[in-house]
A protein has these predicted regions:
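Short, Lys/Arg-enriched, disordered terminal segments
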Residues: 1-2, 121-123
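Long, low-complexity, intrinsically disordered polar/charged segments
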Residues: 1-8, 61-65, 112
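N-terminal, charge-rich interaction modules
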Residues: 1-46
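Short, charged/polar micro-motifs that form catalytic or ligand-binding hotspots
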Residues: 7, 64, 68-69, 93-97
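Gly/Ser/Thr-rich loops at beta-strand to alpha-helix junctions
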Residues: 10-13, 36, 71-74, 98-102
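Helix-rich interaction surfaces within compact, conserved domain-sized segments
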Residues: 13-22, 29, 79-121
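Short, intrinsically disordered low-complexity segments
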Residues: 36-66
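Mid-chain, well-packed structural core segment of small domains
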Residues: 55-85
């Protein structure tokens, strides 16, 4: 079943997102900032490790969602609904074999770097 990991989304957009995902039968998991040092696969699988300390630093200001186990059709439907309902999310990513090993902070850094590189090509 599809799961959407949600990071640092404001209450208004989170409420709208939950309405959309509920209609599409997509599970939403809000990830607390204390889990930001966990690898994404641990968050998805709800596993723990005594070696990983809770995150206690500054939380990125941008919102992020990570699509887990989505079919192309379901992802297209959700992306269309996000546009239609004007749900503002700064970064959208798909869980891959590579990035599932990253922690949340690494994902944010990669997303910020991609956005910066994209903006340079548009300029």
């Amino acid at each position: 079943m599809e799961k959407l990991l949600v990071f640092h989304l404001d209450d208004n957009n989170l409420k709208k997102l939950k309405q959309v995902t509920g209609a599409l039968k997509i599970r939403v998991e809000e990830v607390p900032s204390s889990d930001y040092l966990k690898p994404l696969e641990m968050i998805v699988n709800k596993t723990a490790s005594p070696l990983i300390q809770p995150f206690s630093g500054d939380v990125p200001s941008e919102s992020l969602i990570v699509f887990c186990d989505f079919t192309e059709k379901k992802m297209d439907k959700l992306l269309a609904a996000l546009r239609r309902d004007q749900i503002a999310i700064d970064y959208k990513a798909v869980l891959t074999p590579t990035n599932k090993k990253w922690n949340v902070m690494r994902m944010y850094l990669e997303m910020q770097a991609e956005k910066s590189a994209y903006q340079k090509t548009k300029a």
